[in-house]
Amino acid sequence: GIRDRSPSRGLGDVYKRHIKMRDEAAVKRYERKLKDDVDFWKFVQFKFYEQWESFRAYVNGLGIKILGDMPIYVAMDSADTWANPELFQLYDDGDPIAVAGCPPDYFSATGQLWGNPLYDWDYLEATDYEWWFERIKAASKLYDITRIDHFRAFASYYSIPYPAENAINGEWVEGPRIKFFNMMEEALGKIDIVAEDLGTLTPDVTELMEQTGYPGMKVLEFAFDSGEENDYLPHKYTENCVVYTGTHDNDTVMGWLETAKPEDISYARSYCQMPDDEPFNWGLIRVAYESKADTAIVPMQDILGLGKEARMNIPSTLGGNWVWRLDGAALTDELADKLKTMSEKSGRLED
C-alpha cells in the first residue's frame, strides 16, 4: 500500500525508518491509514484462491497436472523481506549486505546484477528451514508439480557485495545442499519438483541433482549452436528430464528462426531430419515428443507457430512482458487431432 502511493520509488526510498524497521506503533498507524487498501487486497487474494481451487479441481479431474514456478529469491521490497528480515543477509538498518546475481560470462562481460537479498542460510538451518518449507508447502497447494527457478543456488550461490554497479566483484558461496532437501522430505513428505538447471553446471550442482533425483530441464532452442558437444541435443538426454521447445524466457520457435544464425538453422533442420514441407515449429515439437525425456512441454505460441510478437518474457526488462493472451478460437479440433496423433506416434499417451 505504501509503495502504491509512490509508484515511482521502491520501498527502501518510501519507508521512513520506523515503518521500514516494523516499529509496532508505526505498523498500527499504517494499518489504520491503509485499511481500505489492505481489505481490498485481502479480498482479491481470497477470490483468487477460491477460483484457483475450483479450476485446479476441474483440470485434475480431466487428468491434467499443473506445473507452476517458484522463484528461488524474493524481492528486496517484498512482504517476505519486510516481515522476516532475519531470514536474509541484511544490516541492522535493513540494507542488504550482499545481493544475488550471476557472474560475467560469454553473454555479459559484467554479469547480471539481480539485486535480490540473499538468504541467511545459517539462520535458516538453525530454524530447521521452517520458512522455506512453509513456502514450498504453499506452492504445493497451488500446483501439482513445482519448478524451482535457479536451482543451482542450493548448491552454491553468487554473492555480490552491496552496493554494486555490476556483478564483477561477486563470489560463489556454498548453499545448503542436500541437507536442505533431506530435511524437506522428512518435514513435508514427497513433493514433485522440477529443477531449473539451465546454463553452465558446476560439479556441485550436478552432484546435487543426482542426490535429489529431481528431473532437470532441456531446451531445444539452446541445442543447435555448438555442434555435437551441446548437452541440449536430444540424443544426450536421460529419461529423468523435462524437454521444452522453449520456455517463457525464450523467444518463440518461429521468433528464434528469424534471428538465429543460418548455420544453426541448417544444423537444426539436419539434426531433426525435417522434410522440406514440415514447418520448423512442428519439427521441433516432433523431436521433443520423440525424445526419451519423461515429459515434453510445448508453449502454445510454438504450437500455433507464432513469431516474436507472441514472446512471453524478455529477462531483465520491464514493461511489455507477460501480456500475450491465447485466443480460444485458435484451439481447433484439427489442432487437437494433430497433437493427439503426434502423442500416439511418440508413445506419450497413457493407456
Each language-model region and where it sits:
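Conserved, well-ordered alpha-helix/loop/beta-strand core segments that scaffold catalytic motifs
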Residues: 41, 46-74
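Conserved alpha/beta catalytic core and glycan-binding cleft of carbohydrate-active enzymes
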Residues: 87, 191, 197-308
